[in-house]
Amino acid sequence: VKGVGSHAAYPHEGVDSIVATTAIISSLQQLVSRNIDPQHAVVVSVTHMVAGNTWNVLPDDAIFEGTIRTFDTADRALAKKRFYDVTENVAKAYGVTAEIDWIVGPNVTYNNPELSAFLFEKTSAWHDDVVIPEASNAGEDFATYVEQIPGVFAFIGSNAPGSPGLHFSDMVLKDETIPVAVDYYVNNAFALLEKLRKG
């Protein structure tokens, strides 16, 4: 977000990029609630903002970053369109300009239903704590593979009780899940090979 910097005592001599950026961020929080079907899971999260480097100067520009997560491609397209609309128009209203660098992440990971059912059955035969988790908005590059080749993405459940989840520096992994993960891959690889051999 590009404004015009000024001394903090004379904000009228500049165009405040911080005020404009916070207005954009605030407006983006309504993107889901007023544009997307409430039955659909869509998340808009602004996770990082940087502006200025001292206490008495209003900076020329500000940067913010975040992510939009959807399960539906139409929702993804609409969220992107509305993101551009909101960002550019709020910027214009505040007298600043906005430059958007949109990075396309992986699509949603869809497990192959037939393989999922097969692996659930096989894994349940040797492990008594197998569950089908709720859909997750977490992004995963594995989605690119299962778009081309039928596959299954599984969570092993390695996070210790009470420990923070993914991407937290103090996440604690349970060592006892390592053999469970090995068993999952080895047992199911043999089960799938046997299934393929039998046709």
Q: What is the role of each PLM region?
A:
Residues D128-K195:
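Zn-dependent metallopeptidase/amidohydrolase metal-coordination segment
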Residues L31, Q39, V43, W55, ...:
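Mature, folded catalytic cores of secreted/periplasmic enzymes
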Residues V1-N111, S136-N137:
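Midchain, well-structured core segments that form catalytic/ion-binding scaffolds
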Residues S26-S33, D101, G105-G157:
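Active-site-adjacent substrate-binding region
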Residues A23-S26, T70-T73, N89-Y94, T123-H127, ...:
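Glycine-rich loops and low-complexity Gly/Arg-rich segments
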Residues I18-Q29, Y84, S116, F120, ...:
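Predominant activation on well-ordered alpha-helical scaffold segments within soluble catalytic domains
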